[in-house]
Amino acid sequence: MSRRPDLLRGSVVATVAATFLLFIFPPNVESTVEKQALFRFKNRLDDSHNILQSWKPSDSPCVFRGITCDPLSGEVIGISLGNVNLSGTISPSISALTKLSTLSLPSNFISGRIPPEIVNCKNLKVLNLTSNRLSGTIPNLSPLKSLEILDISGNFLNGEFQSWIGNMNQLVSLGLGNNHYEEGIIPESIGGLKKLTWLFLARSNLTGKIPNSIFDLNALDTFDIANNAISDDFPILISRLVNLTKIELFNNSLTGKIPPEIKNLTRLREFDISSNQLSGVLPEELGVLKELRVFHCHENNFTGEFPSGFGDLSHLTSLSIYRNNFSGEFPVNIGRFSPLDTVDISENEFTGPFPRFLCQNKKLQFLLALQNEFSGEIPRSYGECKSLLRLRINNNRLSGQVVEGFWSLPLAKMIDLSDNELTGEVSPQIGLSTELSQLILQNNRFSGKIPRELGRLTNIERIYLSNNNLSGEIPMEVGDLKELSSLHLENNSLTGFIPKELKNCVKLVDLNLAKNFLTGEIPNSLSQIASLNSLDFSGNRLTGEIPASLVKLKLSFIDLSGNQLSGRIPPDLLAVGGSTAFSRNEKLCVDKENAKTNQNLGLSICSGYQNVKRNSSLDGTLLFLALAIVVVVLVSGLFALRYRVVKIRELDSENRDINKADAKWKIASFHQMELDVDEICRLDEDHVIGSGSAGKVYRVDLKKGGGTVAVKWLKRGGGEEGDGTEVSVAEMEILGKIRHRNVLKLYACLVGRGSRYLVFEFMENGNLYQALGNNIKGGLPELDWLKRYKIAVGAAKGIAYLHHDCCPPIIHRDIKSSNILLDGDYESKIADFGVAKVADKGYEWSCVAGTHGYMAPELAYSFKATEKSDVYSFGVVLLELVTGLRPMEDEFGEGKDIVDYVYSQIQQDPRNLQNVLDKQVLSTYIEESMIRVLKMGLLCTTKLPNLRPSMREVVRKLDDADPCVSNSQDTTGKITV
């Protein structure tokens, strides 16, 4: 008891001390709140790459990756996590970070809405959410009075273009472009942002005029309203914005002329007014803009001579003026004092000599001057232009010999001198252009031999030397070109044999050696080029028989006419090329069974004695040999028959318990392939690679090195007489005769015992539907645009073959992305002919085939499927490829499909086409290609069948959309090379 007062006294002292310490050092409640907010923020994100693994509950937020704290208070003031593959959504908990001044999450995959609670971050100065997948309307951010940088461009935001933006008068940078707003005008209130230096409103569905209030933004440095539908005359008031360094007005509907007052913009570095409706003569005053680096005015209606003052500019790097009506001589000094790297002056009416100084500073990479009227020789100075990557000066009137150094461009990917009047030889120096992928020299007057040095161009894909005066033999070194896909040497004076080494060109698709003086036989080794699709040897002096092995190829075109060939025409080749492909070969003949389909076409029927020489001694010898063979065959046959009888008895004894109702297997084999029936029919459920209402697909690895095949087991009845089996086999035989690299190869059909099996070639990369949904390392899509384009072209060619080159034509009736298979090189193959029909059996069926989302609208009220029904379905596939969307998605709305969605998005306005492109693969240099494919998809899905193109037209248009060959601007106004 005596100790209690002391204890009490000690307790009081401790309490007082603790209170004092709490007063001096209060607990960091703020830090706890911030940490909780940050972890709620983290939990709403999908961090598949573990970028936020340093965020640990035991640590201070100040050591978290991407977090910045105030050095004095320790409070969180910044979140910066750009381009780190984050997905998920932004948590409203961000509003608890009241001291936050920077929220920067650009270039991720974040979706959902911008949380309106963000306005509670009153100290926010930087809000950067550009290049994500945010959707919904923009919340009213005007309470953020301190905001200086607002960039939410490059998302999927919608709704109206908000006028409250004009109340944020501290803004220095404003980026709202590349979103999906409703059509609207630029609000006048933007003129109140007096501190604004950067304004980005491109692709915002804007219409109407540029409000005059914008021309009061005296601090403005960058003005970008490209890719809208802004109309009216070019604004003369823009000359008041003397601090401008960049003007982007491309792809609008501006009219009128460029005013001479443009000279006031003395700081201007980039000026892009391309793809409008501007006209008149460009003012000479443009030549006084000494800081100009980029000038693009392509795709307008400008006329007259191009301003000579551009020749005095010393900083100009990019000049793009194609598709106008400029005339006269091109200013001689352009490039003399400036470091040009890109020049496109194509599709004008320039005359006179070709400009001399475009590569004066040895930095020119892209030179496109096609389709003008330039004449004379190519200036010798270009022989030293080793920086060139892409050269296209075709379709002019250039003449004379090409300077030697011009052939050796070590970095060039493409050289196109076609459709001129150039002479001389193709120099052996061409072998030094080792990066070349396309050499296009057709329609000139080149002579001499094809240089052997072409064999050094190991990256070459296309060689076009047709319609010249070339002579000599085709060099065997061409066989070293492993990447070659097209070789056109037609209409020259080439002699000698077709080189056997061509078999080594394993990617060759298109081979044309027509109209030369080639002799000898067609090499049997050509059948080893599995990719070969088009073969033209017409108009030569070839002899011998047509190699039967050529039927192994997946040819869609063949022409051997006008030679001296003899012997039997393989029926499969006759089916591909028709009799005209073999005409003017007097010694060629067709089998009797093929004669009916080739009546009156000048082909004789093969005789069994056609090749026997008629001298008596040989006849006697042959007769003796024939009798000897008959005797041997008879004796052998007797032994074989006896052996077979014994074996049959043994088998009958072994199998006497087998159900007598089991039918024998009927095997229809369409390719030379060793198949074991038991191996095909003993399917393992572990190897199922696909299934549907019609049956299952199995992967089967054949023994004896037979490779891998896909076996489709079809559900069906018991196979009784009259159940349709005979018809099915007949149709399978038609499909089995198809020979096209873009149609899945059917090896065999097995029917019997109540089952039916189809044996197909195996496709390593599955189907297009799956591939479009796959991502690879880094979150990138498996299919970039180059792969998607390749798939589109291949599939189109396959369907075109079915429609136009098969006899009778075949209507697929179920074209869809899951029926387009992909091999190891992403070559597409049309597959699944379960509902396909040959056209000559009638166009009307008792039920509608096809898949919802792909079916043409006319099939809703008619069973008359036609080729145009397939075209519609293929159009849906094209829309899948360019948008990355599925045919049916919830976001389209009830009862809506991808066709409805795309049409509603562009609102019949072609200037909004970019809004529906898949941003995962979209880039400046392939945008034009994507838009062309999109337009073809829209044309194919036109409601009226008669307005849809044929598949041949589709193929032709898709060829024009090649992203690797485009010679013009993309629709963003950026140059496409």
From Swiss-Prot:
Tissue: Expressed in mature leaves, primary roots, and the root tips of both primary and lateral roots.
PROSITE patterns: LRR, PROTEIN_KINASE_DOM, PROTEIN_KINASE_ST
Signal peptide region: 1-31
Pfam families for the chain: LRR_1, LRR_8, LRRNT_2, Pkinase
Residues forming coiled coils: none
Matches recorded under SUPFAM superfamilies: L domain-like, Protein kinase-like (PK-like), RNI-like
Residue positions, PTM Phosphotyrosine: 801, 854, 861
LRR repeat spans: 97-121, 122-146, 148-167, 168-192, 193-217, 219-241, 242-265, 266-288, 290-312, 313-338, 340-361, 363-385, 386-409, 411-433, 434-457, 458-481, 482-504, 506-529, 530-553, 555-576
Sequence intervals crossing the membrane: 621-641
UniProt topological domain (Cytoplasmic) ranges: 642-977
Positions in the Extracellular compartment: 32-620
UniProt-listed GO biological process terms: nitrate import; regulation of root development; regulation of shoot system development; response to mannitol; response to nitrate starvation; response to osmotic stress
Residues of this chain annotated as glycosylated in UniProt: 85, 128, 205, 243, 251, 264, 301, 325, 469, 491, 615
GO MF entries: ATP binding; peptide binding; peptide hormone binding; peptide receptor activity; protein serine/threonine kinase activity; transmembrane receptor protein tyrosine kinase activity
Compartments it resides in: Cell membrane
Catalyzed reactions: L-tyrosyl-[protein] + ATP = O-phospho-L-tyrosyl-[protein] + ADP + H(+)
EC number: 2.7.10.1
Modified residues (Phosphoserine): 846
Ranges for domain Protein kinase: 683-965
Family label: Belongs to the protein kinase superfamily. Ser/Thr protein kinase family.
Function according to Swiss-Prot or TrEMBL: Receptor kinase involved in the perception of C-terminally encoded plant signaling peptide (CEP) and subsequent regulation of root and shoot development. Together with CEPR1, mediates systemic nitrogen (N)-demand signaling upon the perception of root-derived peptides (e.g. CEP1) via the up-regulation of genes involved in N uptake and assimilation pathways.
Protein name, per record: Receptor protein-tyrosine kinase CEPR2
Taxon lineage: Eukaryota, Viridiplantae, Streptophyta, Embryophyta, Tracheophyta
Gene: CEPR2
